[in-house]
A protein has these predicted regions:
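Core catalytic lobe of class I
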Residues: 1-316
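Short alpha-helix adjacent to the SAM-binding motif of class I
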Residues: 314-325
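Conserved phosphoryl-transfer catalytic core
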Residues: 324-335
Length: 335
């Protein structure tokens, strides 16, 4: 669709009531290339952050609550957006990676006037909506453990057990894990027995087998809740190829650039799709550019649908030309 991705009404017109599971965005980098046809590229620092937050908020109503975002940009701008630009605190988000695209064609600069190392990479911020990690930190402590933990805490207080004494008795420094809500885990039998032996009749009088049975009953309920939680997590599949957060793809050159300022390799975008969207997933591209996102979906197995927004009429023509050349079928205007 030819429209403005920072306008919620335009996004709603494109997507309707559909919910995207993946947002792949290659927005303006703030490199001052408006004269070269890159709209909104003369925005810098806080103005660029405002622009980024505007398009993110505009599409949020059409994104699944466990969706994933991939946003390309300069490293400094992406980190400022995350920490200072309002993104990190906009809702509950889970940072995943700063993906580095190694373009394999960097060339050093032998110049006294060049005050930095020559860049040969581009960067992508990858995050997921919602709480994605099921951990047992104090903030995520499950209240169902209270009956077990309260007994342990009560016995420890009664006999004066502290971290240093525990280490003396058991040889490990696990006081916070066994007797507080911070990363709480159930105490192993051999350590519990050492406490019973050390304190005798003064504390830890419950027999371990019965105590463990009580814990196992609670754990069954906990595991059920954990399973339900995992079912709500963002889609992610890293089994289709071996990957790290450094992606090695040659830079796009020649006619394959399609007159775009920061073109991405089709196969690299396909990797994102395979990793963060199911075969029938809906993907939204708020800056469609030369249409790479559409081609990337067509090159892989599955029935993914890409909905793209592009502000420039010039690029709309390029997208249509490129699609028709790739698919060998005429594009159809719907509205």
């Amino acid at each position: 669709m030819c429209g403005d991705s920072t306008v919620e009404a335009n996004v709603r017109e494109l997507l309707g009531d559909r919910q995207a599971v993946l947002i792949h965005a290659d927005p303006p980098y703030g490199m001052g290339k408006e004269k070269d046809g890159v709209m909104n590229d003369n925005l810098y620092r806080e103005k660029l952050d405002e622009f980024q937050m505007k398009w993110i908020k505009a599409c949020r109503g059409n994104v699944e609550n466990n969706g994933s975002f991939y946003i390309w940009g300069n490293a400094e701008d992406l980190w400022r957006l995350w920490y200072c630009g309002g993104l990190k605190d906009s809702e509950r988000l889970t940072f995943r990676n700063q993906i580095i695209w190694d373009k394999k064609s960097g060339q050093g600069m032998l110049s006294e006037d060049f005050r930095m190392f020559a860049p040969a990479t581009e960067h992508c911020l990858f995050y997921m909506l919602g709480e994605q990690g099921f951990n047992n930190n104090a903030d995520n402590y499950w209240d169902g453990w209270d009956s077990v933990l309260s007994y342990l805490q009560g016995e420890a207080k009664k006999v004066g057990l502290n971290p240093s004494l525990l280490k003396e008795i058991c040889g490990v420094g696990n006081f916070s894990h066994w007797f507080t809500k911070s990363q709480w885990v159930f105490i192993p039998e051999h350590h519990y027995s050492k406490l019973q032996e050390y304190f005798g009749r003064d504390g830890f009088k419950k027999e371990y087998d019965g105590f463990k049975k009580e814990y196992d009953g609670l754990k069954k309920e906990y595991d059920g809740l954990k399973k339900e939680f995992y079912a709500t997590r963002a889609y992610f599949n890293n089994t289709h190829e071996s990957m790290t957060d450094v992606w090695e793809y040659p830079r796009v050159q020649g006619e394959e650039r399609w007159n775009h300022a920061t073109p991405k390799p089709v196969d690299m975008i396909s990797r994102i799709y395979k990793s963060s969207s199911p075969d029938d997933g809906i993907i939204y591209s708020p800056f469609l550019g030369s249409g790479t996102d559409i081609i990337a979906a067509q090159k892989i197995e599955g029935d993914r649908t890409v909905y793209g927004m592009e502000l420039s009429l010039e690029y709309i023509e390029i997208i249509l030309q490129r699609w028709q050349k790739f698919a060998n079928i005429p594009a159809k205007r719907i509205n």
